[in-house]
């Protein structure tokens, strides 16, 4: 995005006074990335059900606003999960910038305690309903499941966005660590295996919060 642009748009480094929306309090590592690349960070207050969407809807009328960071489930550091209404309002956004992107970091998608786990509707299908197929990148990883910094990661998005990302990534890596991918598949086997593994984490952590 910084050097090549997104889907034919101007590279972000050429956009003067570029801005990025940051729900606060939030994840400092996210904010540090966009700060490093010269973005003005705009604070968006977190409410009890997610970011202040009225403020987001107003700010994206500026075409120098290029994106927003989101941790939609158990958001750092408050633990808030976005409501269905907030997710739908995200999916219905009409930003001035064609290359505005929601960076949807679903880092805690499998991190409930016991049978109690917040549910969140699928942002990608909601975007499709609003003809905003390209507006979101959704990320997840096993960093907080298996090995911090040495697990596996995934991104979900529209076919156009994924083709765009593949075009960037082919210059930075020959391919993923397939042995590590196989290691994870053989250990977990399926989604039930992931759930069972996470309950072991829960058994260790839950007493600290009781």
Q: For the regions a protein language model found, what residue spans apply to each?
A:
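Conserved core of the PLP fold type I
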Residues: 1-98, 109-130
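Serine/threonine-rich low-complexity intrinsically disordered regions
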Residues: 11, 61-62, 96-97, 161, ...
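Arginine residue identity/basic-tract feature
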Residues: 18-19, 29, 88-89, 101, ...
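Hydrophobic "anchor" residues on beta-strands that sit immediately upstream
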Residues: 67, 101-102, 137
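Walker B catalytic acidic pair
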Residues: 105-106
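Conserved core segment of the aminotransferase class I/II
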Residues: 125-206
